[in-house]
Amino acid sequence: MSAVRIAAGALLRSRDRATSVLTVAAFALPHAFLLAVTGGVMAFGARAAVAATSATGDDPSSLDGMASFYVMLAYFAATLLIVPIISMGAAAARLGMSRRERDLAVLRLVGLAPGKTKLACILETCVFAVVGVVVGSILYAVTLPAWGALSFQGRPMGASEMWVGVVALLVEGLAMILLAALSSWLAMRKVAITPLGVARRSQAGRVSAVGPVLGLVLLVLWLSVGTLAMNLGTAIGMAVFMGFMGAIFLIVNLVGVWSISLMGRIMARASRSPQMMVAGRRMADDPRAVWRSFGAVALVGFLVGIMYPASDSISMSGDSADEVARIVIGDINRGMLLTFAITLALGAVSTAVNQSIRVLDSADQVRALSYMGSPRGFMDRSRRLEVAIPAFVMIVGSMLLGMVFMSPMLAAGGGKGFLIALASAIVGVILIVVASEATVPLRRRILASVREGRE
């Protein structure tokens, strides 16, 4: 076991500073949000328990009577956020495993057994996960008072309400570390460590058009029967609506990956610059890596496109909206934008992590282009196109698609909601593009090694 610890220490020391900081941040941010999301669910649950014992707890027209509805919304938001949180933790582990063939080969050549070599890599990832969990827990604790700026059910969210407790803090920290270990182990399964060297197994991923075809069929069916279903009654209409929306959720990943693959092929064929051609080919070669960066943002954007104009239209309905209804509608809007903002923050860091992985994985390509005389900023411009174009199309497009999907249930109006949703999408795209600039130090380090090799 001492050999494994020594090997893990050697791997830690071989890390560059930029990758180490990014790996810790990729563990810390999702852990902080995981604790905050858990605290929010617990806060609404505690409020519902108190409301159930109040005099108006059985009155569905009062805020106390709607407390259980808020709990349901909190669980729904938590479900939406848990996917990008887990994905980011896994991506942080993959960042630790990228381009480690040389380090692993050195450990193998000095006599460390293949199993112990892999265990050392897993241990190294767990060390970064522990540091990330500690930093994330501190970030969560420090930001607790800031939640008081948000008001739900007519009163602010208190720091004491958002505190999850020591037990939940320890359990979720352990869960994040176990997720890192599992992700690292799965990544190591793709690495072959033999006496002759170290190599990664790779499989060419296929992109199927089945998902987009099903999505188009579902959208056409909904636009055809949606209005009719709503005329049959609220219960029947909502059941049909939720059924169609659930079916679209099941195939959203297939649609997203296929769309990015198609977009990449179009960019490569229609390109008028070498940067655009390289960006398009990289997107077409690995559309799943691009989708992982902001797929969750596109999904939540679809929901914002559905719900925000709808609630805005309801709030403009006139005399039927009493004070309680206005509070509930305002809380729904606020909750959706909060969920979207958290997803954007996760998506931005996820973009930085996944782009760093792609930089490390394409190090040989960067070196080859540099030897051929490519300008220093060539790959940076290509990378910006690779991030900005699909981010804009997928995030803004998903919101617009959500608004189209909701059109059978909406009357005229909702213009304010449309503008707010669209502005949020544009801000999200800008944030993701800015986050991708975190890969610049890595690329400069690779180019510096090329210049040293020439000298």
Predicted regions and their residues:
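Transmembrane helix boundary and interhelical loop/hinge segments in multi-pass membrane proteins
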Residues: 89-110, 355-367
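Hydrophobic multi-pass inner-membrane translocation pores used for secretion
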Residues: 2-7, 18-19, 23, 204-214, ...
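Short juxtamembrane loops and helix-capping segments at transmembrane helix boundaries
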Residues: 51-61, 147-164, 320-325, 405-420
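Long, hydrophobic alpha-helical segments
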Residues: 75-92, 342-349
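Membrane transport/envelope proteins' first extracytoplasmic loop
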Residues: 1-83, 323, 327
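Alpha-helical transmembrane segments and their helix-start/interface "positive-inside/aromatic belt" motifs
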Residues: 12-32, 115-131, 168-169, 240, ...
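Small-residue-rich transmembrane alpha-helices
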Residues: 36-42, 87-93, 129-154, 170-190, ...
